[in-house]
């Protein structure tokens, strides 16, 4: 006897960082590095930050007579290991969501009060 599937609502993944944000790494081997978010993966809660978590990949030669290559590439890190970074005051901060006078919902840094969006 097969069980009926319940009507599940689609899962909505919410991230505190977006592509293009400037973030600071707060944990791991790349701690205190600052970089720009290149890509966001909400399903796994991971982000790729420019110049952080570099991995080397050895590529075989494609054709005969061609030499192989060694490529360094950024690997994803978990989003809980990064904080938004204020370039004006050089400080990392958590974010909160507020509304502007015209009713738009924006992200704001808690330490500095700087509006990001």
Curated annotation (Swiss-Prot):
Indicate the transmembrane segments per the record: none
GO MF terms held by the record: rRNA binding; structural constituent of ribosome
InterPro entries linked: KOW, Rib_uL2_dom2, Ribosomal_uL24, Ribosomal_uL24_KOW, Translation_prot_SH3-like_sf
Q: Which SMART domains match?
A: KOW
Q: Which domain of life is it from?
A: Bacteria
Which residues are in coiled coils? none
Keywords of the record, alphabetical order, are: Ribonucleoprotein, Ribosomal protein, RNA-binding, rRNA-binding
Q: Which Pfam families does this chain map to? A: KOW, ribosomal_L24
Q: Name any GO cellular component annotation.
A: ribosome
Q: Which NCBIfam families match?
A: rplX_bact
Q: What does this protein do?
A: One of two assembly initiator proteins, it binds directly to the 5'-end of the 23S rRNA, where it nucleates assembly of the 50S subunit. One of the proteins that surrounds the polypeptide exit tunnel on the outside of the subunit.
Name of the protein: Large ribosomal subunit protein uL24
What species is given as this protein's source?
Thermosynechococcus vestitus (strain NIES-2133 / IAM M-273 / BP-1)
Q: What is the lineage of its organism?
A: Bacteria, Bacillati, Cyanobacteriota, Cyanophyceae, Acaryochloridales
Q: Gene of origin?
A: rplX
């Amino acid at each position: 006897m097969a069980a009926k599937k319940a009507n599940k609502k689609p899962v909505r993944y919410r991230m505190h960082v977006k592509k293009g944000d400037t973030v600071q790494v707060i944990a791991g081997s790349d701690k205190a590095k600052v970089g720009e978010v290149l890509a966001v993966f909400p399903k796994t809660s991971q982000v790729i930050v420019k110049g952080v978590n570099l991995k080397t990949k050895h590529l075989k030669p494609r054709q005969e007579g061609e030499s192989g290559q060694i490529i360094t590439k950024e690997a994803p890190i978990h989003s809980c290991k990064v904080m938004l970074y204020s370039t004006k005051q050089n400080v990392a901060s958590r974010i909160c969501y507020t509304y502007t006078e015209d009713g738009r919902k924006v992200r704001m840094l808690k330490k500095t009060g700087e509006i990001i969006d």
